[in-house]
């Protein structure tokens, strides 16, 4: 089954982006509820585990909401307050909440503070498809591109124009099948989309990694004890918080677009 995509786009202002996209997101949420209702009537499941999808629940099932973001962070307290009130309104329609982090919440920090959540919550540990077994490096820098457009392409452009990488063995995983940019340096190896086995191999044979500070990536790299460079997506307050929270821990260094490595 494939539920409708929210197709969220992030601009420089998260607040403005969400406001402009609000009507479309609400319409998608309603479609999601209808599709889940159809699936439940056809297959009659007992439990639904929803990965951050507000509409993936049903009155006839036990509904589990999976998220690490129970306490949205924003520089403006009024915006954080409103966002959290709205988010909790949706969360409380579920029966319980699972948090993909350890009991100490070392990965999510304040994001997973559940003190205001009225349904049962439990930490289930980090979720990752990557099995780390570090080997002698053959890649000096592995670049993992991700996220919505246009920020993904802007990130890619900043990497290929970074003069500090001109003498390094660089491997880029673009994370998309979209048309490649022109004029990649000769010392760059480019891959569009790779499978789990290939990605694991690249990570295990890299001397350092440059990527966004998305939570899925942070979970994948939690035991990677070589240098990790995070560049948060501008306007994504979650990534900005996570980058700041992890900066200086376990080999993490936060950079700005275009900054030398």
Report each predicted region and the residues it spans.
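Alpha-helix C-terminal capping/helix-to-coil transition sites in glycosyltransferase folds
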Residues: 42-44, 93, 140, 204-205, ...
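Active-site-proximal region of nucleotide-activated glycan assembly enzymes
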Residues: 59-123
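A donor-sugar binding/catalytic signature common to diverse glycosyltransferases
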Residues: 198-241
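Donor-nucleotide binding loops and adjacent catalytic segments primarily
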Residues: 112-113, 122-208, 218
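Conserved nucleotide-sugar donor-binding subdomain of glycosyltransferases
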Residues: 13-55
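Conserved nucleotide-sugar phosphate-binding/catalytic loop shared by glycosyltransferases and other
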Residues: 1-22, 190
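Short acidic-hydrophobic, aromatic-tinged amphipathic segments that line or gate anion-handling sites
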Residues: 1, 122-125, 190-193, 252-260
């Amino acid at each position: 089954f494939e539920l409708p995509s929210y197709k969220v786009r992030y601009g420089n202002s998260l607040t403005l982006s969400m406001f402009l996209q609000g009507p479309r997101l609400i319409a998608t949420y309603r479609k999601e509820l209808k599709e889940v209702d159809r699936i439940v009537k056809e297959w009659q499941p007992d439990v639904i585990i929803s990965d951050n999808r507000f509409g993936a629940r049903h009155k006839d099932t036990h509904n589990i909401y999976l998220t690490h973001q129970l306490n949205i962070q924003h520089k403006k307290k009024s915006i954080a307050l409103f966002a959290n009130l709205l988010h909790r309104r949706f969360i409380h329609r579920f029966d319980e909440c699972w948090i993909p982090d350890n009991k100490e919440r070392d990965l999510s920090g304040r994001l997973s503070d559940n003190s205001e959540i009225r349904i049962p919550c439990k930490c289930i540990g980090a979720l990752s498809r990557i099995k780390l077994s570090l080997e002698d490096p053959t890649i000096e820098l592995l670049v993992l591109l991700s996220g919505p457009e246009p920020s993904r392409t802007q990130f890619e452009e900043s990497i290929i124009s970074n003069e500090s990488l001109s003498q390094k063995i660089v491997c880029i995983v673009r994370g998309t099948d979209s048309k490649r940019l022109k004029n990649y340096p000769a010392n760059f190896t480019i891959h569009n989309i790779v499978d789990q086995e290939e990605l694991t191999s690249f990570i295990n044979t890299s001397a350092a990694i440059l990527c966004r500070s998305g939570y899925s990536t942070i979970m994948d790299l939690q035991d990677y004890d070589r240098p990790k460079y995070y560049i948060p997506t501008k306007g994504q307050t979650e990534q900005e918080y996570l980058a700041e929270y992890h900066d200086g821990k376990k080999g993490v260094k936060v950079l700005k677009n275009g900054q030398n490595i």
